[in-house]
Amino acid sequence: QRPTPCRENGTVTAGNASGVNDGACALLLAGADAVKAHGLKPRARVVAMATAGVEPRIMGIGPVPATRKVLKLAGLTLDDMDVIELNEAFAAQALAVLRELGLADNAAHVNPNGGAIALGHPLGMSGARLVTTALHELERRHRIGKRARYALCTMCIGVGQGIATVIERV
């Protein structure tokens, strides 16, 4: 039996939507002065961040203009991204973002260890989870000799908005 859609004649079901669950993530952001003062060894740096919005009725597509904006700010392209962490509110939303950005539905560098549908979507920590997951994947790829410099982390943040961050492994 197929899962019941969330609304009449809809396609989003509990089977293709991320679970809203509990979770925790720690992510330390520090400026150069704090890094020096406390003897910290950075693992990555934030290259650029951007937010953007679309009409609220087009829920979930906000990461597209945010991604275009952050790449322009960073002076980079999607081809420069070794890892892309795209938060999946639900499958159709993630596919729409991928297709609008010109990425294949099964691009191996997008959510290589699973996205929110597989891992869950704990509200309030999903952004930190995306950055942490991307950094760990960059480090893993570096250890095995794969290209591992930049990661793009992006998600919709409600009411048509999107946020995107580019990090660089250091």
For the regions a protein language model found, what residue spans apply to each?
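N-terminal extracellular/periplasmic Venus flytrap/periplasmic-binding protein-like
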Residues: 1-32, 37, 100-103, 107-109, ...
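Active-site pocket-shaping loop/turn-to-helix segments
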Residues: 9-26, 47-73, 85-88, 118-133
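Short glycine/threonine-rich loop-to-helix capping motif typified by GTGT followed
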Residues: 56-63, 88-108, 121-126, 163-170
